Structure formats: C-alpha cells, structure tokens
Design a protein with these regions (language model features):
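Glycine-rich beta-alpha junction loops
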Residues: 11, 38-40, 81, 109-111, ...
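Short, well-structured alpha-helical segments that form the helix of a local strand-helix-strand
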Residues: 160-170, 212, 243-259
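Conserved N-terminal subdomain of the carbohydrate kinase-like
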Residues: 1-105, 109-117, 276-281
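Charged C-terminal helix
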Residues: 245-281
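Conserved phosphate/ATP/ADP-binding segment of small-molecule kinases
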Residues: 118-212
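Short, small-residue alpha-helix embedded
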Residues: 146, 221-244
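Short pre-catalytic strand/loop immediately N-terminal to key active-site residues, enriched for Gly-Thr
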Residues: 12-13, 210-224
Length: 281
C-alpha cells in the first residue's frame, strides 16, 4: 500500500477533482490523503459559481505535517488558484522529491482549444512552474498547447509534431509526459514520452524507444472529471509497479467503459458516479 497525497480543489456538486480520484486510488489499494487548494461550489461551466481559496489553510497545514513527520510515496497536484499557491506547492513538491517521493502534475487549465471559464494566461504560467517539478505530467492536448505555446489545431498533428510537443513539455522540466485527447495522423490517441532513466517509484521499458501512441475510438459523449479518472487510474497502476504504457492503457480502458456505462446520464457536468462503477476498475 502506497501513501498518496492529492493536492487539488474540492467541488461540492460534481464527481471531479479529488471527489473522483480518491475512491479510485483507494480501490486500487492505496492510502489516500488530501490537501485542498479551494472549495468550489460547482463546476465552472454553469457560469455561476463560488470559490473559496484555501491558501492560508495550506500554509498552516504543511508545517504541521512536517513536524509530525508525515511521509508520502507520491503526490499529485491539480488546479492551482494563485501564484502564492503554486510557489507553496512547488516548494513542497521539491522537498518531497528530494526525499524520494514521486511527483505527478495534472496541469488543469482547459479543453477543446480554450481555457476553462475563470482561467487566465497567468494560470498557464503557474502550471508551467508546476510541470517543472514533475516526474510525470499528463496534460490534455489543449493544455499541452498552452504549456508549450504551440498553436492548437483542430485537425491535430502528424507524428513528428507530436514528438516535438512531448519534447517541449519535457523541456519544461518534467521527466515524462502523457498527452490525452490528442489527434495524430487522423486518429484519436494518447501520446507518451518516457524518461530515459527509471522514474522514481515505477518501472520503464524503453526497448521500443521513448515515445508511444495508443489510438482509441471516441465515444460521442463527454463527462466532466474523466481527466481526473484517467490520472487516478494511471497513478494507481504506476504505484503498483506497472510501466507507463501499461498504466496508460489501463486508464484508457477504464475511462471508455465508464463513459459507455453512464452515457444516458443527463447532466455531464455532474461527472461519473465512480462509487457505483468501481467494478470497472
């Protein structure tokens, strides 16, 4: 059993963020802890929302944990709401990394070629700083474009451009990268670039080179929180010893099966009720 810390927002009315990730990681055999970056009334797509940042709580909590000697095998960061939060979490992750903790960064910012409602260019800069401390980061294609300043193309990329984008993300400081919701040579896919040395806490197989691409058939139904589900399944498998490509395939299968089972749900903003679907993990 690995000790995993999630640093992300908590949304009151939706299965997204930590609400989606915690039951998955627990089901996969890990002990899960949390440090909320904000309390959010509902997903931002509704147009009306209330957000209470928890920066002061975070600032007070981290020294307490340090004094008590709490240790984590992995930490996964998500949405940051201020420069102060990003610096606080970035410094904490660097300290944990020096102690042997694996750092995962989900640079939550946008989708479909646009930033999420309420996001700004400053958030992009903050996420670049967070990616710089990551053992593994997993942006979607839109977020990868913002991170790398590569223009978003609805038609997607060719393989050479895909590899260049992965290289650009690694150049920010991440040791390995996944890009979800990508489109390469006319096929929907997830892209990966593995480290040329073993990542902390999980195995690699570079016999077929550092890059990989896994195609998938898109289901014409979208839900909030599927990125969080993807991340949680990948982290759970990686921390159980699977390599990056195996973990990516497991995540893709779980997300596909969850969407298929819940495709008749009316409000996509509510996300997927993961607690009712743990058998699909």
């Amino acid at each position: 059993m690995k000790q995993i810390l999630l640093i992300n927002d908590v949304v009151g009315r939706s299965h997204v963020g930590m609400v989606a990730m915690m039951p998955i990681l627990t089901y996969l055999g890990h002990a899960v802890y949390n440090l909320p970056t904000a309390l959010v009334s509902n997903t931002l797509d509704y147009g009306h929302f209330n957000v209470m940042e928890t920066t002061e709580y975070m600032r007070g909590t981290l020294p307490v944990w340090q004094r008590l000697g709490f240790r984590f095998d992995a930490v996964c960061t998500g949405l940051m709401f201020s420069e102060e939060q990003a610096k606080l979490v970035g410094d904490y992750c660097r300290r944990l990394a020096a102690e042997g903790t694996t750092v995962f960064v989900d640079p939550i910012m946008g989708d479909g070629g646009h930033l999420y409602n309420g996001m700004s260019q400053r958030q992009v800069e903050l996420m670049r700083e967070m990616v710089s401390v990551a053992d593994l980061t997993f942006p979607n294609y839109t977020e990868a474009c913002y991170l790398t300043d590569i223009p978003f193309r609805k038609e997607g990329m060719d393989w050479e451009d895909a590899c260049r984008m992965l290289d650009a993300i690694v150049a920010l400081g991440a040791r390995s990268a996944l890009i979800t919701s990508a489109r390469v040579n006319g096929r929907n896919c997830v892209l990966g670039r593995r480290s040329d040395s073993p990542l902390l806490g999980f195995s690699q197989n570079l016999a077929d080179g550092p890059y990989f691409k896994i195609d998938y058939e898109e289901i014409p139904r979208a839900f909030h929180g599927t990125g969080d589900i993807f991340s949680a399944v990948a982290i759970g498998h990686l921390m159980n010893g699977d390599n990056l490509k195996q973990s990516t395939m497991a995540s893709m299968n779980v997300v596909s099966n969850l969407i298929e089972r819940n495709r008749e749900q009316d409000d996509a903003c509510l996300g997927i009720p993961i607690e009712k679907c743990l058998d699909l993990l």
